[in-house]
Amino acid sequence: MNWSNTPSFLEKQRQRLKRYQFQIKVSEQGRVVSVGDGIIWIKGLPGAAIDEILISEDECCIAMVFHLTEELVGAVMLVQTKKLKAGTPIFPLKRVLSIPVGDKLLGRVIDPLGHPLDGGEIPPHEEQGLLDRLSPHILHRDFVNRPLYTGNKMLDNLIPIGKGQRELLIGDNGLGKSALALDIVMNQKDKKVYCVYVLIGQKRSTVSSTIQLLKKANALDYTTVVVAQATALPGLLYLAPFAGCAIAEHWMKKGLDTLVVYDDLSAHANSYRELSLLLRRPPGREAFPADIFYLHSRLLERSTCLSPAMGGGSMTALPIIETKEGEMATYIPTNLISITDGQIFFDESLFSSGFLPAIDITKSVSRVGAKAQHPQIKKESGRMKLDYLQFLDLELFTRFGAKLDAKMQKQIQKGRVLREILKQERFSPLPIEFQLAWLIAYNEGFFDESNLEDIPQILKKIEKEIKQSNLSLGSPREQWKKAIKEWLMA
């Protein structure tokens, strides 16, 4: 080696010093004033911004700025720790919260910060999605024009849902709202729809049973579960729906179809009320802060159908809300009804009578879903909802002993047959071809002479034959009619 051509050590250092540029780095530091109930009050941090991340010196504490006053900064804790106390230094990171996103989250169970809860590896951080961001611009949106098949006879025909729609599931506790949402998720198998199921404030047993049901139906292959249990910090309960939305939003912007279930937003609203009261914000109606409507609209407006120029992806939202004694006119339910594109109302009296799913047709509506229905389904369902509502009115008269003519008696019998057809067991989504088959059979009068107790067996026979046939939604109606007639006569 020729040492004479090698620069000396001193020469190297001299060149390095010439290239060095002195820069002043200013960092803020605050100090904890008090800690309690998941809230941290901090003195200092004059440059703090809402939603900014804060950490302690040893990074044992992660918090988020939630409230600003002239003297103090109010932050919500996102990690439980006993090391935090008055006087602990706190530093801002000058960035907002984000979560890992992408296909590697499929089949995973995570918390709102992206930490694994299923014992698996930490999700990769190559792709990050902001938890809170602006909804897509109006010019970047498209009309809801493609159906999202739910596998439910009542929804796919009478209350249709389109991709990019926001449909509220509302009703008292224990009436089957979550079961219907799980049915819809299970029905997306092989339909190229990625699902995100967000569990907010649920018991450990409920979380466990939900995950087991998804595993049993092989639905976890295309689903991500975001969990903030009832025992979690209020800050995590608040962030859970935004985390689920960020995960689905990433796929939507890639041109994919996604479905998000928020189970449920009652717990989310309660956690936000708790945080707001602890931070001494002025309470409003039912002690909720004044911006609770903005909170939920900001979340749900991110669900949409993007225009072809933006990739054509969609995010369908199914928020769940709990009522008390069937009262829809309380604060949070009325807010969400006005934000969403329709609601599916679950009635306790229907549940008690054995009509499952206990959906009240008279109070349920889909404002934009009909435009997304397949032409064949739309044509066959036609006036079915109106006819069913008229049947319910007629049936009410029979309870008072009113005499009805033959035409009305026939209408009542046909309505009772339809009611029996619409019954469906939990966790048993049905293919859309079967939906078309029973619609044609009903409209052609193939059920008119059947006893009500025979209806389930007839439907099972049709379902079995559908799986073995080559018929599709695009097949001619006469071909469907001929095939159904042969199945029922065999």
From Swiss-Prot:
State a single Gene Ontology molecular function.
Answer: proton-transporting ATP synthase activity, rotational mechanism
Q: Which Pfam families match?
A: ATP-synt_ab, ATP-synt_ab_C
SUPFAM superfamilies attached to this UniProt entry: C-terminal domain of alpha and beta subunits of F1 ATP synthase, N-terminal domain of alpha and beta subunits of F1 ATP synthase, P-loop containing nucleoside triphosphate hydrolases
Superkingdom of the source species: Bacteria
Give its E.C. classification number: 7.1.2.2
Q: Which residues bind ATP?
A: G171, D172, N173, G174, L175, G176, K177, S178
Primary residence: membrane
Record site feature (Required for activity), residues:
S364
Can you say where in the cell this protein is located?
Answer: Cell inner membrane
The topology of this chain with respect to the membrane is: Peripheral membrane protein
InterPro entries linked: ATP_synth_asu-like_sf, ATP_synth_asu_C, ATP_synth_asu_C_sf, ATP_synth_F1_a_nt-bd_dom, ATP_synth_F1_asu, ATPase_a/bsu_AS, ATPase_F1/V1/A1_a/bsu_N_sf, ATPase_F1/V1/A1_a/bsu_nucl-bd
Instruction: Give the first-level EC class, as a single word.
Output: translocase
Provide the catalytic activity annotation: ATP + H2O + 4 H(+)(in) = ADP + phosphate + 5 H(+)(out)
Annotated GO CC locations: plasma membrane; proton-transporting ATP synthase complex
Give UniProt keywords alphabetically: ATP synthesis, ATP-binding, Cell inner membrane, Cell membrane, CF(1), Hydrogen ion transport, Ion transport, Membrane, Nucleotide-binding, Translocase, Transport
Q: Assembly and partners? A: F-type ATPases have 2 components, CF(1) - the catalytic core - and CF(0) - the membrane proton channel. CF(1) has five subunits: alpha(3), beta(3), gamma(1), delta(1), epsilon(1). CF(0) has three main subunits: a(1), b(2) and c(9-12). The alpha and beta chains form an alternating ring which encloses part of the gamma chain. CF(1) is attached to CF(0) by a central stalk formed by the gamma and epsilon chains, while a peripheral stalk is formed by the delta and b chains.
Q: Which family does it belong to?
A: Belongs to the ATPase alpha/beta chains family.
What is the recorded function of this protein according to its Swiss-Prot or TrEMBL entry? Produces ATP from ADP in the presence of a proton gradient across the membrane. The alpha chain is a regulatory subunit.
Q: What is this protein called?
A: ATP synthase subunit alpha 1
Task: Name the species this protein comes from.
Answer: Legionella pneumophila (strain Corby)
What gene is this protein translated from?
atpA1
